Amino acid sequence: MNDAVLELVDLKRSFRQGDVTIDVLRGVNASLRRGEIVALLGPSGSGKSTMLQAVGLLEGGFGGTIRIDGEDVTRFQQGERTKTRREKIGFVYQFHHLLPDFNAIENVVLPQLIRGAGQAEAEDRAADLLARLGLSERLHHKPSKLSGGEQQRVAVARALANRPLLVLADEPTGNLDEATADRVFDQFVALVRDHGSAALVATHNERLAARMDCVLRLHEGRIEA
């Protein structure tokens, strides 16, 4: 049985800048299994964000193959890509991107409603996730009334609200102090593992990367051996 959630085969991406072609991804090969937390480590400009955009089906124009849950999503039309993104992928960013006029629980309920969950079910799910992240007393606070660490924990709950197979995180603790970052990351890892998801975490932080199951070092568009 193949338990790979994500498989990348010869993933490539180039951009034109005037008369010059810039190769950002140069044949990336990788795979993630259920329950696995993998660091995508590299400096700024190494192609980390471009790779997450490809895997997250946020952009087209990539060469190679991306398989999510065994399906070659590079062959999908836009409607199928959107459906896969909503049903199978969760996103966590460095900056939380919470809706400012919605409180914590509403921010976690909304993606579930978009996917078709009932209101009561979505609220129960959101309250449970936020409680596990230590936010039981902050459910009805808007983002402006939450600390940076609390905001990021709401973002983690939102990413996991629809029980995604794959979580993509782009510098998820990069805007937090070290102690807060460690707490948020520990909670993130625990939830991902409990859900049986896989997570690909882009970071330039060697210390954070060392705490994950595996490290993919991206340098000039290639995974280093």
UniProtKB/Swiss-Prot annotation:
EC top class, as a word: translocase
The protein's Enzyme Commission number: 7.6.2.-
Subcellular localization, as worded in the UniProt entry: Cell inner membrane
Keywords: ATP-binding, Cell inner membrane, Cell membrane, Membrane, Nucleotide-binding, Translocase, Transport
InterPro entries, sorted: AAA+_ATPase, ABC_transporter-like_ATP-bd, ABC_transporter-like_CS, ABC_transpr_LolD-like, MacB-like_ATP-bd, P-loop_NTPase
GO cellular component assignments: plasma membrane
ABC transporter domain: residues covered: 6-225
Pfam families named in the record: ABC_tran
Residues annotated as binding ATP: G42, P43, S44, G45, S46, G47, K48, S49
Disulfide bonds: none
Superkingdom in the source lineage: Bacteria
GO molecular function terms listed in the Swiss-Prot or TrEMBL record: ATP binding; ATP hydrolysis activity; transmembrane transporter activity
One GO term (biological process): protein localization to outer membrane
Membrane topology: Peripheral membrane protein
Family the UniProt entry places it in: Belongs to the ABC transporter superfamily. Lipoprotein translocase (TC 3.A.1.125) family.
Main function: Part of the ABC transporter complex LolCDE involved in the translocation of mature outer membrane-directed lipoproteins, from the inner membrane to the periplasmic chaperone, LolA. Responsible for the formation of the LolA-lipoprotein complex in an ATP-dependent manner.
Oligomer status and interactors: The complex is composed of two ATP-binding proteins (LolD) and two transmembrane proteins (LolC and LolE).
Name by which UniProt lists this protein: Lipoprotein-releasing system ATP-binding protein LolD
